[in-house]
């Protein structure tokens, strides 16, 4: 491929450019790192998406930021590595395959573990490349030769090694603890996989009779309020606040537990909220996390009354055994009422923990699980003996070894680690890293790297029978926590580990600081003695344009690929209404979609989408995504494309001043730079400084804004117009200088914008760089590997900046006068000017062209100006008096202006009437009131201008 194989197309067509450059970059290996010891190292980890998932807006936003940082570092000359990978995503992937089997009338239990796992592997191979193809569509400059999968042999080896070492160090153990249990999936789940959903429920008030009469208070019973009467079968106490005078004398007494025949004690604990319900709370340690903690403090027994599929256990009292939890609830409430123990039932709003995957209500359940000890001191022989892994991870941030951006996340991170519980790492699934533990017939456990090693350990312990493998698998987050070092070849010593650990920065949403970020710090510090990364850039979450969370059930999700390629309405509707958890939501979603996208979504291209994400990337805040902004940045790409076409048309085949003379050689020399040339170069230095500051501070919104404003507002809207004048009217030396400036500034802009909009900049650079003397022109070079622009502050020219500022003010004043006098843009009229004579004469050609004037006459004194331009509309800009010499019918113009002033006055009266109406202000939506306030302000400004024009008319 050569850069000059065809001229630049007339219009910007992102699909063709993306299809060309994505594969080309990969073929050229631009993302593959060097290992040059003389260069700085830059590494970044891609948060591994689910292998069977698809790209969502959060991924696309996150990858835009990461790619921007990576391309920037590469262009600064660093040894650069962006490590890609996919996660086996235990629960998510298993659910997908189970649903496929369910549609065929088969369950995983029908197949058995081995055949089911084969099915999952087959599904992974079939669909696992979807998300990596989509990541490529975003233009991510990833070294795909290093792509890992968290269950590949190398990664599995690292996982096993970590588990075995932690167990040998006494930091992994098996025990019975309370966990989040999904009864549909039949497994423990992490907090991240649990949604708290506000629901309508009930608060049942139940009598618990006192065993002994209350002689002091005259009470016969205590009334307990609960939202879960079915769990009372597992109550082991009732508790009151120790300072609650109503019940203090009953502490240590007993009550009858209704429907069971058991007696349970009255205990005191400060956990009780005296204001909630009656101030008496039931304690069920086996089925409530808070009660579990109370039970630990008071050494209470634990009675499990639910099976793993959420049915009442076989040894439960009464006829409740075997009933579903909700059926048992109804039966228990009915029996309580029949026995006169139900005081009242009140409607109550409650937060129900529901499984993110199945929607089932989560049960706190006592089960045997594997845990990593968070607070236990590490033994001798580790990097930090005597200190817990949580303590070491906490110190990494507190000491400044790891920097969180923005800093306000430090307190959140610190608070979580300071109050951390042991980490439940086992899951009752079939897909995942099977825990490397084996049991003999007596239940003795042998943790080992292989079955052979386990048998050797068993034999050494005197156990000679067959061993049974632990069926549980590891939490997906366990293997994810190792990727900073496992993806670089650990436990082997590799060049990658030497160069790229710690990585430079981690880019992540705030929602997984605890689940992933903190655990990576723990594991990496414990096993390598190093932090996993120097900086964590914490960004907000992508929401819809109204700030609502994007979810399929709300019908407000957007597929990044649909924004890149476009999608018609029918396909979009089908996509949004298929596979809903609640199919009844489909009509609502269809209506919302038709309103928002009546003609579907147009193709914006990857660059416009990336620019939109960058512009929204404020520190720490959520991102309200609006497709209207995509349209604006697609327009920006068009503007940049058309500007490049203009530059090429005015430079190809011309002497563009790329000879040996780089500096201004004067009017009679080879190059003679105009004020405008020096101004745009000066301004470019300031923009380069702003962009570099933006990268240093992770302010991609500022980077996007600086580039946008410079390209659109300065280079395109002003400099290109000024350059036209200079090329048409300047000397040969001036023309060469202007052509050189056009090319050099544009080429620099393309390098500057490349980390944000890589496709269009690469395509344009291939055409511009050879003319600018920055490339050979044979197509072998890539913009991705060019030097990133850095400011040369010596090139800042404040005099040129002031000169152009004065020019802009004069041109704007002329344009405003034309608008106020309703002069057609096609009508060329003369400008009479007096003031800074030297400036006005030097700038006259530019003023004439940009303000669409027939001529610019400069007068030496104001008296002559007024005499020559009597009755003409006047503007004063700085020290310059400007008159547009036009003939107008003064009487007719006076009538027209008077009528318009009267009309605008009427509109102002209507607006003021509305805004003074208290009922309107109170009842109308805030947006409507704000709109009316803005209308009033606009009308008042228009009125002031009209009155000013009327006063200017000659008598």
UniProtKB/Swiss-Prot annotation:
Q: Does the keyword Cytoplasm apply?
A: yes
At which positions is motif 'HIGH' region? Answer: 49-59
Q: EC number(s) for this protein?
A: 6.1.1.9
Q: What is its main location?
A: cytoplasm
Show the Gene3D superfamilies listed in the entry.
Answer: HUPs, Isoleucyl-tRNA Synthetase, Domain 1, Valyl-tRNA synthetase, C-terminal domain, Valyl/Leucyl/Isoleucyl-tRNA synthetase, editing domain
Cystine bridges: which residues?
A: none
A GO molecular-function descriptor? ATP binding
Pfam families noted in UniProt? Anticodon_1 (PF08264), tRNA-synt_1 (PF00133), Val_tRNA-synt_C (PF10458)
The chemistry this enzyme catalyses reads: tRNA(Val) + L-valine + ATP = L-valyl-tRNA(Val) + AMP + diphosphate
Q: Which InterPro entries match?
A: aa-tRNA-synth_I_CS (IPR001412), aa-tRNA-synth_Ia (IPR002300), Anticodon_Ia_Val (IPR033705), M/V/L/I-tRNA-synth_anticd-bd (IPR013155), Rossmann-like_a/b/a_fold (IPR014729), tRNA-bd_arm (IPR010978), tRNAsynth_Ia_anticodon-bd (IPR009080), Val-tRNA_synth_C_sf (IPR037118)
- Annotated localization: Cytoplasm
**What does the entry list under GO cellular component?**
cytosol
Q: Which domain of life is it from?
A: Bacteria
The record ties this protein, via PROSITE patterns, to: AA_TRNA_LIGASE_I
Q: Which CDD domains match?
A: Anticodon_Ia_Val (cd07962), ValRS_core (cd00817)
Q: Keywords in alphabetical order, please.
A: Aminoacyl-tRNA synthetase, ATP-binding, Coiled coil, Cytoplasm, Ligase, Nucleotide-binding, Protein biosynthesis
Subunit? Monomer.
The domain-related comment in the record is:
ValRS has two distinct active sites: one for aminoacylation and one for editing. The misactivated threonine is translocated from the active site to the editing site.
Q: What does this protein do?
A: Catalyzes the attachment of valine to tRNA(Val). As ValRS can inadvertently accommodate and process structurally similar amino acids such as threonine, to avoid such errors, it has a 'posttransfer' editing activity that hydrolyzes mischarged Thr-tRNA(Val) in a tRNA-dependent manner.
Q: What family, per the record?
A: Belongs to the class-I aminoacyl-tRNA synthetase family. ValS type 1 subfamily.
Q: What name does the UniProt record give this protein?
A: Valine--tRNA ligase
């Amino acid at each position: 491929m050569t850069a000059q194989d065809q001229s630049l197309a007339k219009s910007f067509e992102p699909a063709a450019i993306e299809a060309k450059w994505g594969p080309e970059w990969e073929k050229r290996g631009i993302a593959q790192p060097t290992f040059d010891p003389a260069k700085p190292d830059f590494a970044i980890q891609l948060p591994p998406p689910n292998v069977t998932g698809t790209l969502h807006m959060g991924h696309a936003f996150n990858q835009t930021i990461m790619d921007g940082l990576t391309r920037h570092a590469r262009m600064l000359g660093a040894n650069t590595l962006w490590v890609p990978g996919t996660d086996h995503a235990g629960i998510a992937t298993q659910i997908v395959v189970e649903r496929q089997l369910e549609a065929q009338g088969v369950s995983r239990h029908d197949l058995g573990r081995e055949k089911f796992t084969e099915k999952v592997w087959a599904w992974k191979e079939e669909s696992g490349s979807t998300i990596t193809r989509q990541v490529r569509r975003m233009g991510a400059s990833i070294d795909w030769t290093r792509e890992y999968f968290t269950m590949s042999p190398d990664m599995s080896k690292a996982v096993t090694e970590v588990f075995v070492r932690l167990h040998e160090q006494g930091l992994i153990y098996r025990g019975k603890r309370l966990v989040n249990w999904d009864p549909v999936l039949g497994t423990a789940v992490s907090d991240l996989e649990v949604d708290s959903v506000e629901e309508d429920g009930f608060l049942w008030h139940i009598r618990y009779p006192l065993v002994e009469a209350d002689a002091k208070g005259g009470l016969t019973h205590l009334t307990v309020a609960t939202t879960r009467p079915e769990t009372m079968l597992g109550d082991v106490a009732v508790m009151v606040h120790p300072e609650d005078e109503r019940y203090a004398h009953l502490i240590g007494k007993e009550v009858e537990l209704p429907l069971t025949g058991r007696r349970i004690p009255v205990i005191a604990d400060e956990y009780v909220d005296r204001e909630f319900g009656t101030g008496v709370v039931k304690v069920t340690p086996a089925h409530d996390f808070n009660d579990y903690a109370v039970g630990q403090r008071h050494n209470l027994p634990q009675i499990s009354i639910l099976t793993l599929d959420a049915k009442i256990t076989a040894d439960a009292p009464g006829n409740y055994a075997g009933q579903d939890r909700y059926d048992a609830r109804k039966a228990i409430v009915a029996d309580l009422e029949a026995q006169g123990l139900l005081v009242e039932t009140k409607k109550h709003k409650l937060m129900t923990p529901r499984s993110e995957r199945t929607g089932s209500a989560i049960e706190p359940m006592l089960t045997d699980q594997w845990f990593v000890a968070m607070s236990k001191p590490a033994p001798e022989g580790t990097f930090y003996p005597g200190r817990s892994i949580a303590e070491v991870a906490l110190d990494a941030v507190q000491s400044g070894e790891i920097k969180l951006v923005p800093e306000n996340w430090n307190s959140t991170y610190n608070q979580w680690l300071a109050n951390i519980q042991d980490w439940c790492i086992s899951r009752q699934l079939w897909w995942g890293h099977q825990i490397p533990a084996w049991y003999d017939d007596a239940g003795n456990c042998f943790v080992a790297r292989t079955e052979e090693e386990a048998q050797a350990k068993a034999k050494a312990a005197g156990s000679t029978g067959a061993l049974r493998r632990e069926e549980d698998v590891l939490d997906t987050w366990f293997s994810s926590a190792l990727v900073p070092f496992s993806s670089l070849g650990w436990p082997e010593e590799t060049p990658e580990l030497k160069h790229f650990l710690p990585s430079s920065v981690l880019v992540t949403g705030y929602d997984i600081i605890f689940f992933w970020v903190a655990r990576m710090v723990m594991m990496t510090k414990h096993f390598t003695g190093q932090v996993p990364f120097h900086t964590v850039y914490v960004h907000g979450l992508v929401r819809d344009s109204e700030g609502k969370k994007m979810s399929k059930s709300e019908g407000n999700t957007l597929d990044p690929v649909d924004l890149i390629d476009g999608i018609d309405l029918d396909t979009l509707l089908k996509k949004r209404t298929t596979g809903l958890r609640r199919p009844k939501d489909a009509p609502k979603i269809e209506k919302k979609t038709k309103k928002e996208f009546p003609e579907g979504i147009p193709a914006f291209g990857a660059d416009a989408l990336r620019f939109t994400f960058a512009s929204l990337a404020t520190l720490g805040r959520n991102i309200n995504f609006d497709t209207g902004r995509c349209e604006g940045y697609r327009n920006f790409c068009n503007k940049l494309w058309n500007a490049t076409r203009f530059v090429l048309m005015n430079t190809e085949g011309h002497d563009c001043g790329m000879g040996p003379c780089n500096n201004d050689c004067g009017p009679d020399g080879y190059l003679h730079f105009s004020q405008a040339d020096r101004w745009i170069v000066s301004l470019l230095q300031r923009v380069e400084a702003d962009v570099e500051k933006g990268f240093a501070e992770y302010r991609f919104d500022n980077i996007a804004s600086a580039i946008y404003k410079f390209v659109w507002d300065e280079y395109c809207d002003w400099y290109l117009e000024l350059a036209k004048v200079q090329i048409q009217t300047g000397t040969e030396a001036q023309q060469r200088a202007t052509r050189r400036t056009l090319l050099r500034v544009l080429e620099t802009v393309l390098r500057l914008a490349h980390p944000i909009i890589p496709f269009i900049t690469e395509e344009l650079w291939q055409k511009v760089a050879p003319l600018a003397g920055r490339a050979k022109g044979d197509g072998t070079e890539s913009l991705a590997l060019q030097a990133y622009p850095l400011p040369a502050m010596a090139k800042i020219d404040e005099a040129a900046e002031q000169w152009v500022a004065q020019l802009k003010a004069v041109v704007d004043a002329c344009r405003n006068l034309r608008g106020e006098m309703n002069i057609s843009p096609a009508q060329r009229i003369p400008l009479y000017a007096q003031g800074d004579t030297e400036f006005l004469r030097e700038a006259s050609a530019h003023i004439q062209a940009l303000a669409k004037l027939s001529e610019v006459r400069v007068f030496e004194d104001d008296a002559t100006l007024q005499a020559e331009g009597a009755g003409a509309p006047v503007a004063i800009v700085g020290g310059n008096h400007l008159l547009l010499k036009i003939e107008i019918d003064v009487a007719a113009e006076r009538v027209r202006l008077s009528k318009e002033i009267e009309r605008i006055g009427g509109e102002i009266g209507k607006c003021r009437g509305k805004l003074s109406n208290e009922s309107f202000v109170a009842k109308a939506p805030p947006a409507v009131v704000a709109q009316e306030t803005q209308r009033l302000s606009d009308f008042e400004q228009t009125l002031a201008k009209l009155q000013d024009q009327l006063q200017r008319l000659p008598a």
